[in-house]
């Protein structure tokens, strides 16, 4: 039978002196501090019931290093299976139980039946026989029926259960050339799927000593022998713990089988080991060592009255949409003699705040002269709150050729691309000022403004442009986003055809993180929302996906290529293509408005409500 997930495995069992120790009295007496262990045990057992695991950690002067935001991720009620890697032994089980109990009182650990002889552990544990290879394996199956039923009943009553699916302590894996858990049992996944419990990934940073790993290579039983000594050497240790977002039971249930669910839980757990990591990359390090060109000082603010006059002078038909607070206008740069300078200044301020930006005093370029500018205007404060830049590809290519498109600076296009997608509207340089980013309404109105612009120009039903993934995201987050869309593009015939006509000028290549298979996790994700959760786990500030990426996905966008923009703070640009004729009708009507949507449908001979 597969080895069951436990806490501590054989760790505490040395206190009951199993045959291995009794058979090696001289060796054990020389290398294993049994007397020290017994004295610790006596002090811990004197603690009040319910506090003995805390007493154990207190006696050892072990401290947790865990972010408060991570502690807030522990569900305070409802059935919960906390899954964790198992790097140390005794320490892991005690630490995880105490950590969970700070958020909720109903915590138990699935642990080794050898520890059942220690009565003080009964209040904390459900005991199972973990061994998979023994002459008594069938007896183990019988012995585990009752405790596993007990575990399921505990979860169905709304309790929390701590599980170490590896079933034994992490050790050196020769094939992977690192210390890691052995393969995980599927028991944790089965408990989640059978009880409807949420799953909580928890990662312990670190591992046991090099001597422990070496002894395990000589004989795995030597690891067991020295687990107690390893624990006693953890005195005054600071244990770094990372907690991921709780995984809804339905997500686990939707995976194909217990094996796939187990793989997902393991990947989500080990993903936490990369939070905040900056992978080693020789080119990146070399660039970092070079003197950087200093950023220019931000341009002076344009006097408000000049900007107000520019907006007031726009023809009435340039108003695309408005609500009580904001209005969205369409204008050419020639109609904005003062406002265009303020627009460039605000762009640069906003992009710099997001770790991007040109480094110039204002973000203005040659494309601004002949592109449309969709302006988000705060009616009460009389100020620009954000903007989009939009260009009709047919007109631009006629006047300037393909090189007249902004995205041609980051992607090389085959002329066949524009024959395939037809008349389109290139979007880019979008921003909402930082002080307006706390609410979603400004960006939503901008998007409605884009839709109204398309409704007024229905001959351009395709949107395309570059959506940025800033370098404020970790390299692994950016790689996961890229890999997710690349995997889906392979399955999308149109996406593959588009990709064949596009070439990134500087292809994005993520620095490799040793022994992490990014594609394995991405292949288990069904939609963009399921990608957002692991991204949030990776990012130290907990941010999810870039909001524009989600917005494009909502209207059916395909990401067909990725480029690293060296001139724009090393952001990753994803080239997105959206055919609004294929967008969900209810979504499109919400953005275009009923009249605009009806006119769009008439122009393209679309039946309302059908794609």
Report the location of each language-model feature:
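Conserved nucleotide-cofactor-binding alpha/beta core module
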Residues: 107-143
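Acyl-donor binding region in acyl/amide transferases
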Residues: 348, 358, 394-558, 563-573, ...
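A short helix-loop-beta-strand connector motif used in the catalytic cores of GNAT acetyltransferases and
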Residues: 366-375, 543-544, 569-574, 587
């Amino acid at each position: 039978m597969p080895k069951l997930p436990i806490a501590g495995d054989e760790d505490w069992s040395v206190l009951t002196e199993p045959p291995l120790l009794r058979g090696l009295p001289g060796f054990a007496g020389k290398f294993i501090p049994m007397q020290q262990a017994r004295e610790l045990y006596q002090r811990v057992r004197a603690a009040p019931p319910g506090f003995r695991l805390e007493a154990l950690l207190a006696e050892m002067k072990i401290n947790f290093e865990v972010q408060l935001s991570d502690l807030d991720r522990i569900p305070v009620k409802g059935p919960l299976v906390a899954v964790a890697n198992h790097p140390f032994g005794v320490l892991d089980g005690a630490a995880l139980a105490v950590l969970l109990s700070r958020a909720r009182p109903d915590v138990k650990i699935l642990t080794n039946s050898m520890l059942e002889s220690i009565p003080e552990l009964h209040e904390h544990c459900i005991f199972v026989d973990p061994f998979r290879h023994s002459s008594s394996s069938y007896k183990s199956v019988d012995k585990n029926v009752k405790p596993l039923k007990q575990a399921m009943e505990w979860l169905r009553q709304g309790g929390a259960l701590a599980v170490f699916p590896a079933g034994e302590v992490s050790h050196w894996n020769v094939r992977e050339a690192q210390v890691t858990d052995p393969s995980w049992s599927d028991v944790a996944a089965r408990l989640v799927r059978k009880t409807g419990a949420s799953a909580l990934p928890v990662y312990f940073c670190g591992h046991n000593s090099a001597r422990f790993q070496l002894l395990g290579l000589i004989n795995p039983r030597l690891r067991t022998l020295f687990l107690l000594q390893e624990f006693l050497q953890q005195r005054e240790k600071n244990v770094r713990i990372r907690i991921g977002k709780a995984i809804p039971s339905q997500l686990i249930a939707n995976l194909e089988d217990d094996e796939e669910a187990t793989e997902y839980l393991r990947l989500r757990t080990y993903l936490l080991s990369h939070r905040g990591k900056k992978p080693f990359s020789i080119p990146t390090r070399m660039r970092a060592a070079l003197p950087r060109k200093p950023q220019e000082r931000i341009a002076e603010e344009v006097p408000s009255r000049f900007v107000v006059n520019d907006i007031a002078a726009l023809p009435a038909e340039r108003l695309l949409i408005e609500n009580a607070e904001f209005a969205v206008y369409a204008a050419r740069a020639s109609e904005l003699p003062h406002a265009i300078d303020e627009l460039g200044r605000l762009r640069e301020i906003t992009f710099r705040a997001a770790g991007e930006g040109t480094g110039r005093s204002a973000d203005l370029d040659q494309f601004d002269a002949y592109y449309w500018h969709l302006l988000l205007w705060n009616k009460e404060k009389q100020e620009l709150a954000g903007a989009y830049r939009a260009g009709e590809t047919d007109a631009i290519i006629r006047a300037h050729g393909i090189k007249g498109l902004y995205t041609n600076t980051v992607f090389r296009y085959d002329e066949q691309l524009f024959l395939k997608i037809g008349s389109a509207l290139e979007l880019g340089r979008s921003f909402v000022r930082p002080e307006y980013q706390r609410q979603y309404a400004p960006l939503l109105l901008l998007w409605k403004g884009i839709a109204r612009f398309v409704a007024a120009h229905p001959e351009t039903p395709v949107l395309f442009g570059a959506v940025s993934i800033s370098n404020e995201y970790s390299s692994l987050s950016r790689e996961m986003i890229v890999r997710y869309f690349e995997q889906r593009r392979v399955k999308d015939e149109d996406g593959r055809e588009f990709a064949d006509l596009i070439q990134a000028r500087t292809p994005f290549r993520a620095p490799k993180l040793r022994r992490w298979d990014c594609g394995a996790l991405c292949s288990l994700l069904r939609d963009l929302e399921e990608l957002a959760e692991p991204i949030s786990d990776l990012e130290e500030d907990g941010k999810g996906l870039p909001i524009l990426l989600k917005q494009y996905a909502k209207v059916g966008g395909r990401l067909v290529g990725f480029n690293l923009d060296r001139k724009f703070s090393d952001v990753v640009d994803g080239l997105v293509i959206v055919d609004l004729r294929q967008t969900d009708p209810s979504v499109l009507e919400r953005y275009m408005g009923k009249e605009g949507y009806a006119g769009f449908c008439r122009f393209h001979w679309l039946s309302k409500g059908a794609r």
